Curated annotation (Swiss-Prot):
One of its GO terms (molecular function) is DNA-binding transcription factor activity. There is a cross-link at residues 20, 24 (Glycyl lysine isopeptide (Lys-Gly) (interchain with G-Cter in SUMO)). Expressed in the retina (at protein level). One of its GO terms (cellular component) is nucleus. The keyword Ubl conjugation applies. Residues 26-64 are annotated as: Disordered. Residues 159-222 form the bZIP domain. Keywords: Activator, Cytoplasm, Developmental protein, DNA-binding, Isopeptide bond, Nucleus, Transcription, Transcription regulation, Ubl conjugation. It comes from Mus musculus (Mouse). This is Neural retina-specific leucine zipper protein.
Length: 237
């Protein structure tokens, strides 16, 4: 059962202004995209890439992009190198470009450390043998060697310490060998000198023994002679 149109309702509809409402339009790129049927087969084709701190357009237009950890770290490093006055007012891209123009940055912190380029490391290893010669290692004390090895690699430091220990032991052995040889030569010279003195003393003893026998024989002849020989006995004594 249909009711007749009310005059008040018709008047309200005629007076209603539809132009004051905005018309919602669908984005054109959404229609020209991949069909709905193909979305199920490629689930990752419609997923946008994750935004980074270097792409401010990916963030909403009403707010500024939030700085990431890497951006904050680079800005802090730049502030330490150039001072806070020069860093203020720089964008992240300008800060990174300025850091790259400054050269390699020494990074020490939770993100890692800068150990130098391979060329610098090779040059350091080449300079170490020139700086630490055998004579320098032997004459250098342990404290001085540890001070010189600061900043050197652990393997290189262990190798130099082992080399110094080997040179020290070799020097001690050579010194002991030289000392023993010197003592041996001294003892041999002393033995030869004492042997010569012994031979001289033996010759002197033999000479004195012969003189003793000669004097004893003369004494026996004088005592066994005639009675007149007693007056001349004192001449031979």
């Amino acid at each position: 059962m249909a009711f007749p149109p009310s005059p008040l309702a018709m008047e309200y509809v005629n007076d209603f202004d539809l132009m004051k409402f905005e018309i919602k339009r669908e984005p054109s790129e959404g229609r020209s995209g991949v069909p709905t049927a193909s979305l199920g087969s490629t689930p990752y084709s419609s997923v946008p890439p994750s935004p980074t701190f270097s792409e401010p357009g990916m963030v909403g237009g009403g707010e500024a992009p939030r700085p990431g950890l890497e951006e904050l770290y680079w800005l802090a490093t730049l502030q330490q190198q150039l001072g806070s006055d020069e860093v203020l007012g720089l964008s992240p891209d300008e800060a990174v470009e300025l850091l790259q123009n400054q050269g390699p940055v020494s990074m020490e912190g939770p993100l890692g450390y800068y150990s130098g380029s391979p060329g610098e490391t090779g040059a350091q290893h080449v300079q170490l043998p020139e700086r630490f010669s055998d004579a320098a290692l032997v004459s250098m004390s342990v404290r001085e060697l540890n001070r010189q090895l600061r900043g050197c690699g652990r393997d290189e430091a262990l190798r130099l310490k082992q080399r110094r220990r080997t040179l020290k032991n070799r020097g001690y052995a050579q010194a002991c060998r030289s000392k023993r040889l010197q003592q041996r030569r001294g003892l041999e010279a002393e033995r030869a000198r004492l042997a010569a003195q012994l031979d001289a003393l033996r010759a002197e003893v033999a000479r004195l023994a012969r003189e003793r026998d000669l004097y004893k024989a003369r004494c026996d002849r004088l005592t066994s002679g005639g009675p007149g020989s007693d007056d001349h006995t004192h001449l031979f004594l």
